Curated annotation (Swiss-Prot):
Monomer. Binds 30S ribosomal subunits, but not 50S ribosomal subunits or 70S ribosomes. One of its GO terms (cellular component) is cytosol. PANTHER family: RIBOSOME-BINDING FACTOR A, CHLOROPLASTIC-RELATED. InterPro entries: KH_dom-like_a/b, RbfA, RbfA_dom_sf, Ribosome-bd_factorA_CS. The keyword Lipid biosynthesis does not apply. PROSITE patterns: RBFA (PS01319). It comes from Coxiella burnetii (strain CbuG_Q212) (Coxiella burnetii (strain Q212)). SUPFAM superfamilies: Ribosome-binding factor A, RbfA (SSF89919). Its main location: cytoplasm. Gene3D superfamilies: 3.30.300.20. It is found in: Cytoplasm. This is Ribosome-binding factor A. GO terms for molecular function: ribosomal small subunit binding. Belongs to the RbfA family.
Length: 119
C-alpha cells in the first residue's frame, strides 16, 4: 500500500469511527469497532473491517451497515477534504474472534497437560 493510500485509509478509519459514535443513531451500530480500512490503488473503493464489541447478531449489524453506507459516505464527504470519497464496503473481521478461539484452545490444552502430569 502506498503512503497516499495509507494516509487516506487512516483518515477514513478515524473519521468513520467518529461518525459512527456521534452521528449514527442505529443502536445496532453503537457496539462495533472499526479494526482496519483497506483502500484500492485508485482510491475509489474502501473496505472497512469491523468487529463486534458485544454479543450481537453479525448479520443484523451487517444489514444496518449496508443500509447506512450512503449516509456515512455523505457525512464522510462533509468531514474530509477528499476530492473523491470512495465507495464503502463493510466487512466483518473474524480475526479477533479467531484469536480468542485459538487462545481458548491453547489454554484448554495446557490445563489438560497439567492434569495429565499430576495423575
Amino acid at each position: 500500500m502506498s503512503q497516499r493510500q495509507q494516509r487516506v485509509a487512516d483518515l477514513i478509519h478515524q473519521q468513520l469511527a467518529e461518525l459512527l459514535k456521534k452521528e449514527v443513531r442505529d443502536s445496532r451500530l453503537s457496539k462495533i469497532s472499526l479494526t482496519a480500512v483497506s483502500i484500492s490503488p485508485d482510491l475509489k473503493q474502501a473496505k472497512v473491517f469491523y468487529s463486534l464489541l458485544e454479543n450481537q447478531n453479525e448479520k443484523e449489524v451487517q444489514k444496518a451497515l449496508n443500509k447506512a453506507t450512503g449516509y456515512l459516505r455523505h457525512l464522510l464527504a462533509q468531514a474530509t477534504v477528499l476530492r473523491y470519497v470512495p465507495k464503502l464496503e463493510f466487512v466483518y473481521d473474524e480475526s479477533i474472534e479467531r484469536a480468542h478461539r485459538i487462545s481458548f484452545l491453547i489454554e484448554r490444552a495446557l490445563k489438560k497437560d497439567d492434569s495429565d502430569e499430576s495423575s
